[in-house]
């Protein structure tokens, strides 16, 4: 009987660990999904041909203060990693962002697959715990 309790405790520990992994994956998926949404909006802006011409608008510079600004859509300053930025033509920026979107989608799909496998294993563990509990109650 003591062996069953230890085995049950181990199963519960494994289930709790898997649950924390699932929660972690959910958090990463949510974060990547938010990034994906922002990148899609940016790509839509870059592809918007109606606003090819320079456009005057107001941008917030902080503390509720705005400044008039002009956006020219022929070149953009783009982060390339490690705090490094480069100036790039519009079409190259669109291509780069499209590639990033594909990578983000691939990452989200991989994480969803990992999550599905973990959830299946988690559910099997819960069934084993329930089965063990039923056996202990019948003893």
Curated annotation (Swiss-Prot):
One of its GO terms (biological process) is protein folding. Pfam families: Prefoldin. CDD domains: Prefoldin_alpha_GimC (cd23160). Signal peptide: none annotated. Its main location: cytoplasm. Keywords: Chaperone, Cytoplasm. It is found in: Cytoplasm. Molecular chaperone capable of stabilizing a range of proteins. Seems to fulfill an ATP-independent, HSP70-like function in archaeal de novo protein folding. HAMAP family: PfdA. Belongs to the prefoldin subunit alpha family. NCBIfam families: prefoldin subunit alpha (TIGR00293). This is Prefoldin subunit alpha. It comes from Picrophilus torridus (strain ATCC 700027 / DSM 9790 / JCM 10055 / NBRC 100828 / KAW 2/3). The lineage of its organism: Archaea, Methanobacteriati, Thermoplasmatota, Thermoplasmata, Thermoplasmatales.
């Amino acid at each position: 009987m003591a062996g069953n309790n230890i085995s049950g405790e181990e199963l519960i520990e494994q289930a709790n660990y898997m649950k924390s992994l699932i929660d972690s994956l959910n958090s990463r998926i949510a974060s990547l999904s938010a990034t994906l949404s922002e990148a899609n909006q940016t790509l839509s802006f870059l592809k918007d041909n109606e606003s090819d011409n320079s456009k005057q608008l107001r941008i917030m510079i902080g503390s509720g203060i705005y400044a008039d600004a002009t956006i020219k859509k022929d070149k953009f300053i783009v982060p390339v990693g490690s705090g490094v930025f480069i100036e790039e033509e519009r079409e190259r920026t669109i291509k780069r962002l499209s590639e990033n979107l594909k990578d983000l989608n691939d990452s989200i799909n991989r994480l969803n697959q990992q999550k599905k496998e973990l959830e299946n294993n988690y559910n099997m563990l819960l069934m084993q715990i329930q089965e063990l509990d039923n056996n202990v109650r019948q003893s």
